[in-house]
Amino acid sequence: MKKAICGFIYYKLLGWKTKVSVPDYDKYIICAAPHTTNWDLFIGKLFMGAIGRETGFMMKKDWFFWPLGPIFRWMGGIPVDRSRKTSLVDQMIKIAKSSQKFHLAITPEGTRKANPNWKKGFYYIAQGAGLPIILVAI
């Protein structure tokens, strides 16, 4: 049902087209760029829903306030606190290794502005957990 609803919205209402398919691996990192608008999240979630996949995503912790916080968590959101010194990369590697399925989308710019200096966390998570990286352009 969710796949049909997401597909209807993504393909019919919004008129998006897909030029490639996402491999059906049990675990992977999606590196999505460029990230230029907050709508990227919703377009990406609709696309993944339309092809029948669940994908988590990382987002600045400032967005996880009431009432959006519970909604973003329900959608698969992982709050990122950039001021903490603990390694989110190590936590994600541990979760990926211990999970049967692990699909995580990351925007490497770390912001919605053009940034040629990508953050490398997506790469370190993939390397540490032995995951393939799927590059996606929006």
Where are these regions (language model features)?
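Soluble catalytic domains of membrane acyltransferases
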Residues: 3, 7, 11-138
